[in-house]
C-alpha cells in the first residue's frame, strides 16, 4: 500500500512532445492547401514566404494611416495659427484662396467698463466673411442690377453722356416696368400709363421686342366713322384717299423669347403695350 502511494504523484502532468505540434501544424497547412478558401491559402503563402502573419501587415497599415493623419492635422494647425497671427487688414490666404474677415468694430462691445486686462490676454477671434457660394446668394447682385437699370433709363433720356465732373441727374420717373405675360421677360423699363385705360402703356424705348412690319393693323377713329356714315347717305362711291389717311396704321409687336403679341407700333415710332405684366419701377 505504501508502495502505491509512493509511485503516485498527483502533480505529475504528461506534456506533449515537441514533435506533436509540428505534425499538427503541418497537417493543418496541408489541409488548408487542399481544402481551404482562397483567403486562407493567400495568408498561408504569405506566412511561408515572408514569415509575417496577416496581423503584422495590418498593424503596419494602421501605423501608416496614423502617421498620415498626424501630418494632416499638423498642416491644418499651422494654417489656423497663421490665420490667428495674420495682419488686421481682414484678408487672409489659405490654400490659394483669399478669405475676407469682418472689421473688429462690428463685434466690439459698447460697454466701457469691461476689464481691459482680460481683453488684452484674450486673443481676439476674427470673424470670416462667408463667400457667396456658402450664402447661396449674392448680397450685392440687387444693387448691381438696380445700377444697370438706372444707367439704361438715363441713357434713354440722354443723361448717359455726361461729363465726369457734372452732377449726376436723378433717374426719370416711370409708371411701371413691363414684362411679358407668358415668359416674364422684361420688355420696357421706362413707360407712361394711359390716362383712361389703366392696363395700357406707351413707350419709345423697349427691349426684347420684335415688330412684324409685314402685318398691318388699321384703326378708324370714331369721328371718322360718324362722318362716313353721314356721307354714305349722300353718295355711294367708295372711300377716297383722304379717308384712308385718317385711319391709324399699326404693326403688331411680339416678344422675342416666346412670340407672344404684347403691343402695337404706330407710325410715330411709339409702342402701345396692352398685353403685359406691370410691376413697380
From Swiss-Prot:
GO biological process entries: negative regulation of transcription elongation by RNA polymerase II; positive regulation of cell population proliferation; positive regulation of transcription elongation by RNA polymerase II
The species this protein was found in: Mus musculus
Assembly mode: Interacts with E2F1. The C-terminal half binds the N-terminal of E2F1. Also interacts with E2F2 and E2F3, but not E2F4.
Name under which the protein is recorded: E2F-associated phosphoprotein
Role this protein plays: May play an important role in the fine-tuning of both major E2F1 activities, the regulation of the cell-cycle and the induction of apoptosis. Promotes S-phase entry, and inhibits p14(ARP) expression.
UniProt GO cellular component terms: cytoplasm; nuclear speck; nucleus
Sites of Phosphothreonine modification: 37
Record keywords: Acetylation, Cytoplasm, Nucleus, Phosphoprotein
